[in-house]
Amino acid sequence: MFAYIRGRLDYKNNDFLIVESNGVGYRIFTSLSTIADIGEVGGEVKVYTYLYVREDNISLYGFVNQEELNVFELLISVSGVGPKAAISVLSAISPSRFSLAVITDDIKTLTKAQGIGKKIAQRIILELKDKINKEQLTSNIGIEADIGTSGGDDSKVSEAISALMVLGYTPAEANKAVSAVYTEDMDIETIIKNALKGLARP
């Protein structure tokens, strides 16, 4: 119903925002990361929104960027994951880290979110792994990797390097770690996992 709402930020706390637009105040539930990034009360803001409608509940959820909204929509598509759990995930980890956790079966990262136990984390990975493709991961990271335009091997290497960079490693560290473990028969998940093991060694 609403793609986004642009207006004046009237109020914010750890759970929701109130944005006034054309004389109407919208209560928008959101993540801690959006609360931190949205700006000061009184300023103009743009919030990407999702209207959640159930028989006993109509609520508006929103985020400061499209990437958070995309992950929110993916999460609530998972059986047993509602909006509150999705908000909890987005409050704990960034969209790029979420995407990386899913494609690398990183249950530990997902369970950092309050209310997300091991079983739910496993279900998230199972149901979303095929939906989070290489292009989406690289887009979330914000690094150009020429996925889909380069050869298959170059694509896997570029994507693995990009994934390590989002975890805080420098381009040089990421490139060295990937080069040390890469073989042609590896898929992207195996490359990343093996590279991380190498980086973890003293």
Model-inferred region functions:
Residues 72-76, 87, 107-111, 161-165, ...:
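Amphipathic alpha-helical segments within well-ordered protein domains
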Residues 129-179:
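Strongly charged, low-complexity linkers/loops
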Residues 111-114, 124:
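Glycine- and Gly-Pro-enriched alpha-helical subdomains that act as flexible
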Residues 1-73, 77, 190-198, 202:
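Structure-specific DNA junction-binding interface
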Residues 51, 58-59, 83-102, 123-128:
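Amphipathic, charged-and-aliphatic alpha-helical interface segments
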Residues 10, 50, 76, 91-94, ...:
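Signal for well-folded cores of large energy- and translation-related assemblies
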Residues 86, 98, 121, 174-177, ...:
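Small-residue helix-packing motif on alpha-helices
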